A protein has these predicted regions:
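Conserved luminal/periplasmic juxtamembrane motif of membrane-embedded glycan-processing enzymes
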Residues: 1-443
Length: 443
């Protein structure tokens, strides 16, 4: 439908469905319902612009599905981006059909989904979304300085430099090493391909909105509808879809990209990046030999410069936290860590494939075949062990607190107990301030 080859379409599909954001939220039904809705909604508008009239009713059903079943904030962002998509297609086709189709399927979809929308709108005034949220409550997950590393190393977490998955600060960027490099290479097509230019703009916005100092999230907070939603990570759903499409466009047009006078510089940049990765890993390896001396130096600095600004728990507490995080840092970048090993090899092999193609060691046809196999293996191997298993005893055996409650309440009162704290409970116990993520564990 976007004039992509079967190989490019397959790679885009793999990158979209198996990207990190989908893996992270896949177990949550409203989020998993978004996966199908996003591509189908854009597809419906595209089909309508091409005079395929069957997509008017199909598009209405897709709109209703999104409104009734998917996560509202992401659906809202999809509708906003969908309007821009319709404007883009109107400009390309010189027809008003994309605009008319967009408003028609949106309106009819809303009517079909009214069984859910009307009760929600009626109840909305009793919720925190009944009025505009203050900006200080809106964003808590802006991109940290080292978060871009997760485009290549999806499991890496560096204290104070990356977001923390276990705290809901979700830096989910990974779509595969080669697919991300292909998406970057699509920049060479921006002036030649309007479709690539549009989706490149979507990617750029979805990334810039997550950077605090750009002020974009603050600006759109003043627009109707946007002021009811919080958390910039929701834009990752749109961004990952756009990145996957760009990877497909780049693959099919790689011969044109190779003709660019800047392509050699691109390859040189990849070589430097590969060498930097290797050097960094070697440095981390040798740091392990001086672990104790480095930790002692960190302890001295913390005791002299940082301790007075904390809650001044016993020093042993802070030293234990520092040791724990330092060990996690070393382990995260160790070849004994399966996920790091796969990530590291994926980066080097992806760059090697580009280098061999640039040097004419492999032709375009073989590049596509190798890319398909590599992307599949990369995305399958990298997510092995992503979902951790919980011991059955954690569920079937009552903790002491639950046993006490069950033994001291009347037997005819039927209670069900869930032993795990919901995500927000750490706020209630003062582990850290939700508006200040920098003090995790150190206060």
């Amino acid at each position: 439908n976007l004039s992509l080859s079967k190989t490019a379409s397959t790679i885009s599909g793999l990158a979209y469905m198996l990207n990190q954001n989908h893996l992270y939220w896949g177990a949550t039904l409203p989020f998993s319902n978004v996966y199908l809705f996003i591509p189908l909604f854009f597809l419906a508008i595209l089909k309508i612009s091409r005079n395929e009239n069957w997509w008017w009713p199909w598009g209405s059903l897709i709109g209703a599905y999104g409104l009734a079943a998917a996560e509202t904030q992401i659906v809202f962002y999809t509708f906003v981006t969908g309007f821009l998509w319709a404007l883009f297609l109107k400009y390309n086709t010189k027809s008003w059909k994309p605009i008319l189709g967009y408003f028609s399927i949106s309106a009819i979809g809303a009517i079909l989904a009214k069984f859910w929308l009307l009760p929600v709108l009626n109840y909305l005034k009793f919720t925190t979304r009944g009025a505009a949220l203050s900006f200080s409550d809106l964003a808590y997950d802006f991109m940290r300085i080292a978060d871009p590393l997760r485009f290549f190393y999806p499991y890496i977490q560096l204290p104070q430099f990356t977001g923390w998955e276990n705290l809901g600060i979700v830096p989910n960027y990974y779509i595969g090493a080669l697919t991300f490099l292909l998406a970057i290479a699509s920049i060479f097509l921006v002036r030649k391909n309007k479709m690539v230019a549009f989706w490149s703009g979507v990617v750029a916005f979805s990334l810039l909105v997550r950077i605090k100092w750009t002020g974009i999230f603050w600006v759109i907070h003043f627009l109707p509808g946007f002021d009811r939603f919080r958390g910039v990570f929701h834009w990752a759903f749109i961004g990952s879809f756009a990145l996957a499409l760009l990877a497909g466009f780049a693959l099919d047009n790689l011969e044109k990209i190779k003709e660019s006078r800047h392509f050699k510089r691109f390859i040189s940049g990849l070589k430097i990046f590969a060498l930097t990765n290797i050097i960094f890993v070697v440095i981390i390896f040798f740091i392990g030999f001086f672990r104790d001396k480095i930790l002692n130096g960190i302890f001295k600095f913390f005791d002299a410069k940082v301790y007075q600004n904390t809650r001044q728990f016993p020093l042993e507490h802070y030293h234990g936290v520092i040791t724990s995080e330092f060990n996690k840092f070393l382990d995260a970048l160790s070849f004994s860590n399966y996920h790091f090993l796969i990530s590291f090899l994926s980066v080097l092999i992806a760059i090697l494939i580009f280098v061999l193609y640039q040097k004419n060691k492999i032709d375009f046809t073989n590049f596509k075949k190798i890319a398909l196999v590599f992307v599949f293996l990369n995305l399958v191997l990298i997510w092995q062990g992503y979902y951790e298993f919980i011991s059955q005893s954690k569920i079937t055996n009552y903790p002491n607190t639950v046993s006490f409650i069950k033994n001291h309440y009347p037997q005819d009162y039927r209670y069900r107990f869930f032993r795990f704290y919901p995500p927000e409970s750490y706020q209630e116990f003062g582990v850290f301030d939700v508006k200040d993520w920098t003090d995790y564990k150190l206060k």
